[in-house]
Amino acid sequence: MINVTKADGSKQPFEKSKIVRTCLRMKAGKDAAEEIADKMERRLYEGIRTKQILKMIFSYLGEYKPELKHQIGLREAVCLLRPKPDFEQFIGLLLKTEGYDVEMNRILAGKCIEHEIDAIAKKDNETLYVEAKHHYQPHSYTGVGVFLEAQATLEDLNDDKNNFTKAVVVTNAKLSEHAKVYAGCKNIGAMGWRYPEGKSLELMIEDNKLYPVTLIKGLDSTLLARLGDNGIILVEQLVRYGVEKLNKLTKVSKSKLKEIFNKANEIL
């Protein structure tokens, strides 16, 4: 039995089914996913790191889905977004695709103190106070403390006659077990990596094709900052702007932008 080394240094037995599931999430067919898993199983060695396994998956998937050679892993891509304003704007766009009217970055008075609110989302009779919690490390956990703070903020806001239906925490990390239990007990909405089942952050991104621009290989931090400063967070937005407009906004050469534009089109 081969053991793989996780990002935190711990080891766990290799599970072939995880390779298949990863390939399927990347829209590979079932036959292709199983064939890739078979190939990888023959190449693995004791202690191989999960990051190296992901690179191998992308390499093999590129034979079946050429567009994947232009992108990095989705989880890593979301981690590369700046917490403010990029990740917050990203969550705002996601909520809009779910039919919410969204207001970003409000300061509201509670009974005791003022609170900086990442987003307010309204739909039908529902008004959500949304907390966006970003992590740079892809294998971090969002702990119960974030949910304790969200609940305290909600109570202080509503004590001053605000009318929020509930608090919602959206994070690009997994949730700790204590966080899940507390969120369920206090009726706090929670969305994170692989949580909740069927409505997790990565599924929402994939189902709506809300791919962050950081997914595209070859974008340096300067260009990403210029795109973010102009509100361009998604691959779809980048394509919609086109090379000419992007050139005026970013001052990056048209030849470089055309290369990026072509990669973006293939991803979509």
Regions found by a protein language model. Name each.
Residues 14, 28-31, 48, 142, ...:
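Short coil/turn linker and secondary-structure boundary residues
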Residues 89-91, 204-268:
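C-terminal extensions
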